[in-house]
Amino acid sequence: RQRQMCIRDSGSSLLERFLDNASEIGRTVICVGSGNEGAARGHFAGNITRDGRVELAVGNYERNLNIQLWKNYSDVFRIRLQAPGGEEAELSTNIQGGKYTLELEQTRILVYLGEPLPYAVAQEIYLDMIPAEGSYINAGIWTIRLEPVVTVTGQYYLYLPAGSGIGESTGFYRATPQVTLTIPSTAAKVITVGAYDQVYDTYADFSGRGYADSTRTIGVAAAGLTKPDLV
């Protein structure tokens, strides 16, 4: 089963490394689809200089929603989360135990702070939003504000669950389709295949993709890859 690419997925996960090793045996060629997250509005990438502001639309009748924020461990951000009604709270990134709970309006937010892992240069801050009252979380525009305190790379990435896990009305207003590959298409030695729209004679908008950019040091770009390899 494919899943959306997280920032640390730069070809170093167990599955990706297995496919890379397998491709070196004999005349083995492994092809992998790039996924269908290209137009899902579930991914956002930015490079913070002063203040970063990300708006997330949450549709009606969402029973829960999780948000992954990935950044370099060396970067320190001040992060604030604002609910649709205007109530806001600052997210602490230095809590003993690495997890805590807060409430904004009728939504309870469980915050989990990632720890260092082998091969990982990125930290995950995981937000799990569930109803505090009623059956659904607050619908409307949620705003995430990031203010740099210590900046090394300044890069940050936000991910929502895969398209089938959320409603069609839920997504980032300024989504970034260039970070939408799914594992294992991020493996370095496989041939990643994207989708082609023969009606419009162009790359299919739903097809996942990733980029190589020397100014970015997290994810597929860290490995110096541009995916897909073939359409």
Locate the predicted segments by residue.
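Loop-rich non-cytosolic ectodomains and luminal regions
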Residues: 1-4, 8-231
